[in-house]
Amino acid sequence: MALCRAIAGRWLVAGALGLVLVAGSGPAAMQVPAGTGAPDRPTFEAFVARLREDAIGRGISEETASAALDALTPLEVVVQRDRAQAEFVETVDQYIARRLTARFVRQAQAQADTHRALLRRIEARYGVPGSLVVAVWGLESNFGRFSGVRPVPQALATLAWEGRRGQFFREELFAALAILDEGAISPGDMKGSWAGAMGQPQFMPSSYLDHAVDFDGDGRRDIWRSTPDVLASIAHYLQNHGWQSGERWGRPVRVAGAAVEAVSGVPLRDAGCRAVRELSAPRRLDQWQRLGVRTAEGHALPTATREASLLKAGRRHYLVYRNYEAVLGYNCAHAYALTITQLADRIRGR
């Protein structure tokens, strides 16, 4: 799972595939609270020694704590990435266009075909369509081709010591140690992004503990090497964040003429991460119809009474349902969620 953080009023999407500063997108599912680094922080060696003591106090075995933490040195590249300003800004439309290339869509469709039987079993268990699972897999790690090369314990210890979001990364480090204690992977093989997002789904360690599953039945929740575990874990995460089986995520719509002023009277949400607060309060489809909202082709909206929120992202408007918010739970940025959902639609041939 990608990790986002606030920088200069915008939001940085950080995952194994790199960084992009997305204007108008929101914080991630695990928003990292900013803090102020202490000028009198201990040396890295002293800090890690205290982490080791605290980890053992939390029930982590001495063997795991020693294997993961002994002789660690800070990763300067991690500190630089954490502090860096992105060098370019992408709009939502640019973000989507740069990722949803014809070649990438074909690759995603091929992956869905290759794993069709597995994805059907996963959908039967978790209610999440295989097209959506493959879309997340593709955007997070290019279908498992690149899931990060940074040693996760070292990266998290560095970020915890660096201090600006120290408590968050300290807790993630303890979660990583719990994973090592579980025996899912060795310390040397626990690799991920500079921010500690791990494996092919790019889960933070705490998300691994909450959502990773052993779908191949080998006794380990292996999101690094086991394709069944990877894809099922993505589905389980989305299910746990509210994905409703058989429902769609939303649709592009047309808001033109008098409808522009009419919809402006609908208030925005007042709770949730930034991306959620950029959604309108929900209204029934027939209410949006009366306000002048139409399908992207200019036709009447469906007559269903389900509720939807209006979203203006880039140059387009969308009516989005609860399932869209489940995708925001993976990474709370509209550029990300719209890329995922539109890729899933293209995989399904819509």
Put a short name on every predicted segment:
Residues 73-74, 140-144, 197, 255, ...:
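Solvent-exposed loop/turn segments at secondary-structure junctions
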Residues 13-24:
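Bacterial N-terminal signal peptides
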Residues 259-350:
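C-terminal soluble interaction/assembly domains
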Residues 1-15:
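Bacterial N-terminal signal peptides that target proteins for export
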Residues 65-89, 137-141, 151-153, 252-261:
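Acidic helix-start/capping segments at beta-turn-to-alpha-helix junctions
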Residues 220-280:
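Ligand-binding pocket segment of bilobal, Venus flytrap-like solute-binding proteins
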Residues 92-233, 239, 249:
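Acidic/His-rich structured neighborhood in mature extracellular/periplasmic domains
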